[in-house]
Amino acid sequence: MPSPEISPGAPCWIDLMTSDIAAARQFYGELFGWEYETGDAEKYGGYTTARKNGKTVAGLMQKDADQAGMPDVWSTYLRSDDAEATASAVAANGGQVYMPPMDVPEQGHMAIFGDATGAAVGVWQPREMKGYELVAEPGAAAWHELHTKDYDAAVKFYQDVFGWDTDV
């Protein structure tokens, strides 16, 4: 299957922040048949890329010591052509920028924000790393869903910030 064409505003990546990266690698490796490549520790903080059949499907990263009480969490990233403009749109539409846009050397720009209901979502502006290379197949992401405490506010937020066309 060719790599997917990912439109702005669409999910393009997931990663797991975990307290035990070795256990996570073993678990998902056995469950999905993932293989791993760990990036340069100095440049990328030891970020691990998961691949299925040689194609990127997800990332994993070890939580810092100061995050010890925080549960392990999967994050979804939405594609953006301009992470700075997206961060501004987030703030202008009732969201909160938790982590301002930052450069990931050679790979792209990322940011983490809370939508108008407080749900955390990432933004990825690609350069070298475009996002998923495999989707909707066994061992790869197939569906993303937002559980929210305020459905109408969430729908309006994603329509206004990402131009989503929703049928509700």
Language-model-detected regions and their locations in the chain:
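Short, conserved beta-strand segments within well-ordered enzyme catalytic domains
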Residues: 15, 49, 59-61, 75-79
